[in-house]
Amino acid sequence: MLDHPKLTARQQQILDLIQAAISRTGAPPTRAEIANTLGFKSANAAEEHLQALARKGVIELVSGTSRGIRLRTDTVRNINAARGTSFGLPLSALAPLMLPLVGRVAAGSPILAQEHIDQTYSVEPSLFQTRPDYLLRVRGMSMRDAGIMDGDLLAVQSAHEARNGQIVVARLGDEVTVKRLRRTTQGVELLPENPDYPVIRVAPEEAFAIEGLAVGLIRNSMSM
């Protein structure tokens, strides 16, 4: 029998909301977004439930960031398995995913070129709502406030289109970067989630392409 904490109905709602937000945008929700979605009067009410989930070992709270919520993947997997679901998919229909881990990407070459693949990971499908195609090792702290830290493994679904606000893997010139996409009347901007880093404004003459969408995250402590 799987060992997992018992959640209240409200705690399960919040966990489902966190998982759905990470799958949809690549980042967890803010306290204000949780409060608004679930009808709490204030973000403080959401914080109380998050603290309870942290005490039960379901999530880890990262101080100093508005989106500092990180899933403890082993515990979440057990909870999903006990419910007989994996983000709405029948558990019995799922097999382990074999995902290539992409390290540094050479200028001008495809992300999934063989020379970029460091190794292949066997990953539980229950960690994701949207099936990823590969893992990308995060370098740097430009997405810190989205809960994406240096050394984390970002789960990426290959895609060439994205909605405003989604976290994307983008190619700009000879560089590949992970940022939040924003389209304006003036053009495309790539937004960091750390005030120490500048907004990247894509010039019309620059070579720019979306390579993928962030659909999940594996903490660096899990990737060793």
Swiss-Prot record:
InterPro entries per the UniProt record, alphabetical: LexA, LexA-like, LexA/Signal_pep-like_sf, LexA_DNA-bd_dom, LexA_repressor, Peptidase_S24_LexA, Peptidase_S24_S26A/B/C, WH-like_DNA-bd_sf
Pfam family membership, one: Peptidase_S24
GO BP annotation list: DNA repair; DNA replication; negative regulation of DNA-templated transcription; proteolysis; SOS response
EC number: 3.4.21.88
Alphabetic keyword roster: Autocatalytic cleavage, DNA damage, DNA repair, DNA replication, DNA-binding, Hydrolase, Repressor, SOS response, Transcription, Transcription regulation
Catalytic activity: Hydrolysis of Ala-|-Gly bond in repressor LexA
Top-level taxonomic group: Bacteria
Residues under site feature: Cleavage: 107-108
Gene3D superfamilies on file: Umud Fragment, subunit A, Winged helix-like DNA-binding domain superfamily/Winged helix DNA-binding domain
GO terms, molecular function: DNA binding; serine-type endopeptidase activity
DNA-binding region location: 31-51
Catalytic residues, chain numbering: 142 (for autocatalytic cleavage activity), 179 (for autocatalytic cleavage activity)
Stated family: Belongs to the peptidase S24 family.
Subunit details: Homodimer.
Function, as annotated: Represses a number of genes involved in the response to DNA damage (SOS response), including recA and lexA. In the presence of single-stranded DNA, RecA interacts with LexA causing an autocatalytic cleavage which disrupts the DNA-binding part of LexA, leading to derepression of the SOS regulon and eventually DNA repair.
Name of this chain's protein: LexA repressor
Organism, scientific name: Delftia acidovorans (strain DSM 14801 / SPH-1)
Recorded name of the encoding gene: lexA
